[in-house]
From Swiss-Prot:
Homology family: Belongs to the HypD family.
Superkingdom: Bacteria
BP terms from Gene Ontology: protein maturation
Binding residue positions for Fe cation: C36, C64, C67
Gene3D superfamilies referenced in this protein's UniProt entry, alphabetically: 6.10.20.100, HypD, alpha/beta domain 2 (3.40.50.11740)
Protein name: Hydrogenase expression/formation protein HupD
Keyword Iron: yes
The keyword Aminoacyl-tRNA synthetase appears for this protein: no
Keywords: Iron, Metal-binding
Family matches, as Pfam families: HypD (PF01924)
GO terms, molecular function: 4 iron, 4 sulfur cluster binding; carbon monoxide binding; iron ion binding
């Protein structure tokens, strides 16, 4: 199958891994962070860490949109869903994320809240048309990839004159969060050292490669945009190793079959028409990050659920035993959490990192435990 099988070829993967092992200096460390939930999943699924030399270490960043949602915003969504006049709809993974007191949208639905799962924002628009006596609120989440579809339905709602449709906007921005990662307390203290970034795939198809230029310029941190297949990731890792060996810090694009420098101009223009950048936004694990999220422009304010329902900011209560915030910062791994595997599992998630398949904990639970057990048996 074109563009799938050829990027999963085992012989080529072994050749790339051998090249990385040959070129990686065993006397130094290569600490590389992926910033995409799809990459996290692929890294575990295809056993990429098992192919790398000990000097190349992969660190998982805040690339899972479900995982980075702060509990306070989820509390606000649950408050909305419990209003008798509201139907709240969102993507499936968000239904299971624990909020304050381990309440989730799924539990709120079991207690009679009108919560619907959808696959596309267009379904929310149709729901509003079919239920004129209800207030339909789309709980919008995600990075730049999922933002244009939300912008499109807001424009469509305005053209249709829909009075019972609004959006609770929680779209976040990748480059701002990457800046924040390099400014975390662990990074400043030197306990979290990052030598390079694996740039996100889907996000980069929208924003292009140009927005990553500040990372080599300001921080001396190289970045290579990679696709999702195992050969994509291995080639990107080899490119990062070569940059670091040569003392270079550049933005390189391994995923040339889908990513350009300028990105998707139409998608970016659509987003720009409907949204503007917030002054600040709270991220799980990172705290308040300046200019890291979007809000609905004044021209579309009638579709802003925060304004329509006069929602007040909430401070959520984190599970103190859950290490998800530190895992999202790259400061800890899933194995460092005492809840991991028991009692926290995909069937009983105590933190957001265990909910989505793109979360580091869920990916490690699905694929990493078996490899760890095999390593321990081999010892």
């Amino acid at each position: 199958m074109k563009y799938v099988d050829e990027f999963r070829d085992g012989a080529t993967a072994r050749q790339l891994a051998a090249r990385i092992a040959a070129e990686a200096d065993p006397a130094r460390q290569y600490r590389l962070m992926e910033f995409c939930g799809g990459h996290t999943h692929a890294i575990f699924r295809y056993g990429i860490p098992d192919l790398l030399p000990a000097s190349v270490r992969l660190i998982h960043g805040p690339g899972c949109p479900v995982c980075v949602m702060p509990i306070g915003r989820l509390d606000m969504a649950i408050e909305l869903a419990r209003r008798p006049e509201v139907i709240l709809c969102t993507y499936g993974d968000m239904l299971r994320v624990p909020a304050s007191g381990r309440v989730s949208l799924l539990k709120a639905r079991a207690e009679s809240a009108a919560v619907r799962m959808l696959y596309s924002p267009a379904e929310a628009l149709k729901l509003a048309q079919d239920n004129p006596s209800k207030e339909v609120v789309f709980f919008a989440i995600g990075f730049e990839t999922t933002t244009p579809p939300t912008a499109l339905v807001i424009e469509q709602a305005q053209r249709l004159g829909l009075k019972n449709f609004s959006v609770f906007c929680n779209h976040v921005l990748t480059p701002a969060a990457m800046h924040a990662i390099l400014a975390t307390p662990e990074a400043r203290a030197g306990t979290l050292q990052l030598d390079g970034f694996i740039g996100p795939a889907h996000v980069s198809t929208v924003i292009g490669s140009a927005p990553y230029a500040p990372f080599p310029q300001q921080y001396g941190t190289p970045l290579v945009i990679a696709g999702f297949e195992p050969l994509d990731l291995l080639q990107a890792l080899l490119m990062l190793v070569r940059q670091l060996n040569e003392g270079r810090a550049e933005v390189e694009n391994q995923f040339t079959r889908a990513v350009t420098a300028e990105g998707n101009r139409k998608a970016k223009a659509l987003t720009e028409r409907v949204f503007e950048v917030r002054e600040s936004f709270e991220w799980r694990g990172l705290g308040a990050v300046p200019h890291s999220a979007l809000q609905i422009r004044e021209a579309f304010a009638e579709f802003n659920a925060e304004r329509r329902f006069a929602l007040e900011p909430r401070t959520g209560l984190e599970n103190k035993a859950c290490e998800c915030p530190a895992i999202l910062r790259g400061a800890k791994s899933p194995r460092d959490c005492k809840l991991f595997g028991n009692p926290c599992t995909p069937d009983n998630p105590l933190g957001s990192c265990m909910v989505s398949s793109e979360g580091a904990c869920a990916a490690w639970y699905a694929y990493g435990r078996q490899r760890q057990a095999a390593v321990e048996v081999a010892r």
